[in-house]
Amino acid sequence: MGVGTMASCTDGFEEANRQGNRASADELGRDNYSTGSFFIQMQNNAFPEQENAYQMNEDLIGNYLGRYMTYANNGFSDKNFARFNAPNGWVRYPFRDALPKVTSAFKDIERLTNKSGVTYAQALILKAQALLRLTDMYGPLPIGEESNVNAYSTQEKVYKTLIANLNTATDIIQPIIIASADAKANEEYDKVYSGQLSNWFKLANSLKLRMAIRM
């Protein structure tokens, strides 16, 4: 009798004690909000738009070394990547900022999708986009080895892992766009291609080609 009473008292305990300003798991699952929010987080770091993130992840490094931009701020003239003496804050920023944000959001999408479906495929492509830039900056990266998630993988291993991930993504997307060339998914959350899956397919293949040329 006591056991039955205790069970009934604790039934729905977590929901009953949920703060009123916090969404429930059921509410977060509506309209793909859970996966969509993590999808946006991955986009924001694979293709940074926010001014500070863009400056530190793209502009001060690749855009200058690629001769797209030059340093106009006198404060940047003494120490920068072109002089090979960039401040430590510049050097470590992408690793400390983009890497954890991309990988944490990807893990959540991986969990929510059970490693299947279009959203998972798009997440694999975004992960490849982000990690390709990072491994070209730093070389070896911790990409989640099964034996030791904190172990650093060689750049060769990173490239091969990303290509395998992109193959998985294109295997998911290709049958969909063969059936319907204008197929879309996650339109409301897709800031890159507005859900157009054929463009995601092209991006995946472009990333594979970029790595193949470098290998």
Regions found by a protein language model. Name each.
Residues 8-69:
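Membrane-proximal, proline-rich intrinsically disordered regions
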